[in-house]
Amino acid sequence: MKIKKIMHNIFKGLITALITPFKDNKLDLYALERIVKHQIKYEVDAVLIAGSTGESSSLSFEEYKLLLQTSVEIVNKCIPIISGCSSNNTTYARALAAESTKIGVDGFMASPPSYVKPTQHGIYKHFEALHEACNLPIMLYSAPTRSGVDFSDETILRLSKLPRILALKDCGVDLERPLRIRATVKKDFNILTGNDEVVLAFNAQGGVGWTSVASNIVPNICKELLEKWNKNDTKGALEIHQKLLPLYTALFVESNPIPIKYAAHYLGLCENEIRPPLTEASDSAKKQIENIITSLSIKI
């Protein structure tokens, strides 16, 4: 019963994929507090720490632990915390999952191992190992443009039968997929989109929410959009979605999280510091971001 309760609270609704703030090439814990408290203020359904948007691949293991520990302290059980545990090394991914459990997050997310191109059986065994490494609920993360490999529908079905694998975050472009998955998996397996621009279309096909990049700076508007959708106010949700579309576009004009890091900096949340091999936003991208922030009257 406890696992089902956690699933209901975490893998559903608006989950913000948080940026990780840096200053002088170190974690900026003061900025982290501003960022996290901004999410708590607008009652997002959960925050995702150390995912793709959080530059997880640039973090040392010690930084990863400090980031999670500090986030748990700041949140103080106000909202659930999901940690990112993706790695192309199964042993290291297990270590991330075990450390997440020890620190006290509420669940974790992981993608298939990137670069090494495992078979579907290899992907299954990777997640089976993560499942055995901890007691936390798990969300699968499908991001084929990043990882270079994806779950087949059959592998998702197999993995959904493991008792603590409870959701899928899908960053693909196949809008039929949630319908196909929904038809085969257990009833309480949730599917969410990771693409801001398709949230309404995705949820119309069986999704139950989204992990958002834009909600780093507009959690209040994203929350309102989902609330209208869940109340069957399709017109109201669509109006908000159309208003946000230029923001979604601006935030992906260059590789995520380059634009959202600059947007957060422009609004005073953190330094515009991003780790190599990523570089800060180009001048043209900065101008596009500034213009849409001004036109939408976004303030922190």
UniProtKB/Swiss-Prot annotation:
GO terms for biological process: diaminopimelate biosynthetic process; glyoxylate catabolic process; lysine biosynthetic process via diaminopimelate. GO terms for cellular component: cytoplasm. PANTHER family: 4-HYDROXY-2-OXOGLUTARATE ALDOLASE, MITOCHONDRIAL, DIHYDRODIPICOLINATE SYNTHASE. One of its GO terms (molecular function) is (R,S)-4-hydroxy-2-oxoglutarate aldolase activity. Homotetramer; dimer of dimers. The record marks S52, Y115 as: Part of a proton relay during catalysis. It is found in: Cytoplasm. This is 4-hydroxy-tetrahydrodipicolinate synthase. Pathway: Amino-acid biosynthesis; L-lysine biosynthesis via DAP pathway; (S)-tetrahydrodipicolinate from L-aspartate: step 3/4. Its EC number is 4.3.3.7. It comes from Rickettsia massiliae (strain Mtu5). It catalyses: L-aspartate 4-semialdehyde + pyruvate = (2S,4S)-4-hydroxy-2,3,4,5-tetrahydrodipicolinate + H2O + H(+).
